[in-house]
Amino acid sequence: EDNHSTVEDDAANYDFDLFVIGAGSGGVRAARFSANLGAKVGICELPFHPISSEVIGGVGGTCVIRGCVPKKILVYGASFGGELEDAKNYGWELNEKIDFNWKKLLQKKTDEIIRLNNIYKRLLSNAGVKLYEGEGKIVGPNEVQVTQLDGTKLSYSAKHILIATGSRAQRPNIPGQELAITSDEALSLEEFPKRVVILGGGYISVEFASIWRGMGADVNLCFRKELPLRGFDDEMRAAVARNLEGRGVNVHPRTTLTELVKTDGGVVARTDHGEEIEADVVLFATGRSPNTKRLNLEALGVELDRTGAVKVDEYSRTSVPSIWAIGDVTNRMNLTPVALMEGTCFAKTVFGGQNSKPDYSNIACAVFSIPPLAVVGLSEEQAIEQASGDILVFTSSFNPMKNTISGRQEKTIMKLVVDAETDKVLGASMCGPDAAEIMQGIAIALKFGATKAQFDSTVGIHPSAAEEFVTMREPSRRVPGAGKPKTNL
């Protein structure tokens, strides 16, 4: 089926070839690339604010304003805590009392997200994209209405409409839920929280546990499962939990919060085990939901799934042929570089004359806990589930060289999952310092189908932790795949 648009054919009938709702990672990429391919593009975004709502957001979106970027800045900030400890055995005599100034770091973080917000606006204008500030709503298959801050409604027609409105943190429905904050507020707290309770087992909860603990807070992390980070490799999940505990986080598995109560001293969080934990701040990191409620999609027949995410085909097209969607709002793989890939593929498909499907295989990702976890490809559990033959698992667990002097007791763990028959490396994971920096290179190898023999033929960089990935000679175990025919021999 032909998705292409020739920009001339009936452009005269529309104000724009493309109108994008949402100027975050995906929306900005799609708008710029479409404009570079000759399309006339309009885009709308809510007014800027570090904490989002249905009517405020900002150019740059979650990643830049209240996501990856400010989060990573805080992770860097928190990491110095452990580094200063480790420095002592390396001869650094830090005699005066060391204080941490949260307000200073927060101000620097805010300056940086404002700088990036301006850079994103400049990227749009340099590409010739027309930016409108206000809330977008789709009123017809080819018509968008933008409501400005003062209530003025503007209407524009477009041959194609792209939904790129992203997602927002959601709150569990428990008594006292209004006393809790989400990741939005956590990145912009006025005062440093000395006592924190975090509810959630995903990457956001684990990262904030590391951030606040690294800065000296008393942290209680509660999650429903036995281990945090469902969906990641079980061995890595256990390593992350162990490291959190080793660095002083109070970990509460198989625990959820039943009620929050305001007290003079702060907030008391009650758990389903009957515990009461007093905190200055309670953070809910219990998932995100797509921003689709106010777009008028049902009225237009744009199909949504049960979570409210926009359903799309493999080219990011919705059930209405002139309307497309990319990024978190489609709930495919909610990562910034994935939204960028989807935006690029959309522009090529619709305005570049080449049908391009996003490829979701072997996308590396990281959890910026301290120390971090990074993975690419299949976890051991996924590989076993999908395999029809045997799986070879290679693991290495070691005390990094840096720790031998600092005295820190924290093992790095690495793993390769290999198809025994073809020798192809199906997955790699690592929990330890610099995991994300190391995994990006491994991801290239996996993307191109590297075998274990090719890993083995690579000479390592010595001394480094990364070299362990090319020196794992003997498998730790051989596991039959779930689809392997059972014999009774």
Curated annotation (Swiss-Prot):
UniProt binding sites for glutathione: S25, Y120
Cofactor(s) recorded in Swiss-Prot or TrEMBL: FAD
Binding-site residues, NADP(+): G201, I204, E207, R224, R230, G287, A366
Enzyme class: oxidoreductase
Catalysed reactions, semicolon-separated: 2 glutathione + NADP(+) = glutathione disulfide + NADPH + H(+)
Any single GO CC term annotated in Swiss-Prot or TrEMBL for this entry: chloroplast
Keywords of this entry: Chloroplast, Disulfide bond, FAD, Flavoprotein, NADP, Oxidoreductase, Plastid, Redox-active center, Transit peptide
Major location (coarse): plastid
Catalytic site: H462
Residue stretch of the organelle transit peptide: 1-2
Disulphide connectivity of cysteines: C63-C68
Tree of life domain: Eukaryota
Any one of the GO BP annotations: cell redox homeostasis
One Gene Ontology term of the molecular function aspect: glutathione-disulfide reductase (NADPH) activity
CC cofactor note: Binds 1 FAD per subunit.
Enzyme nomenclature, EC number: 1.8.1.7
Subcellular locations according to the entry: Plastid, Chloroplast
One Pfam family hit: Pyr_redox_2
Binding-site list for FAD: S25, G26, E45, T62, C63, K71, G136, D328, T336, H462
NCBIfam families: gluta_reduc_2 (TIGR01424), PRK06116.1 (NF004776)
Function: Catalyzes the reduction of glutathione disulfide (GSSG) to reduced glutathione (GSH). Maintains high levels of GSH in the chloroplast.
The family this protein is said to belong to: Belongs to the class-I pyridine nucleotide-disulfide oxidoreductase family.
Protein name: Glutathione reductase, chloroplastic
Organism encoding this protein: Spinacia oleracea
